[in-house]
Amino acid sequence: MTVYRTIVADPPWPYAGMGPVGTGGRGAAYVRNSPSPSSVARYGSMSIDDLKAIEIPTAKDAHLYLSTTNAFMVEAHELARSWGFVPKTILTWGKVKDDGSPSSKTGYYFRGATEHVIFAVRGSLRLTSDHAEPTLWLWPRLPHSVKPDRFYEMVERVSPGPYLELFARRRRYGWDAWGNEAPTEAEEPTP
């Protein structure tokens, strides 16, 4: 069994439990453009306890890139710790339109135009390159849970393999992919 030194995870956060106004769900309210119950059902979700119970064959010294939204920032930190990682910093993807303006779609309270990645470390693994990577990326919005290739390229520059993408929707060349939507074949690298 492969033991991974770098894990990228985009968990199926349980938005269904947040509920509309008046349901008592976490105190959050559905607002116009919030994730609809049908979109939540389309993508499925897992409870926080089920996410914490996942066992990942991880090296003693490893990196975790854990995607989250504003609504699950606290739970994401808890999840990283439950998997044996210590959160170190937050990387933010500012989703922009072609003209550079924010591409906000859904959200609780405010319309979200960002997605966050908690960078966490297990053991004492350092970055493999200098600290020239920014903590803010201004990249176009992509389909649900799809990350830009530039994100994976950055991960490969600063974190060692073997690589695992957990809850993958595509299979990147040179990476293992776990998830009920992960294709069986890896995408060939583009020249």
List PLM regions with ranges.
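Class I S-adenosyl-L-methionine-dependent methyltransferase catalytic core
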Residues: 1-191
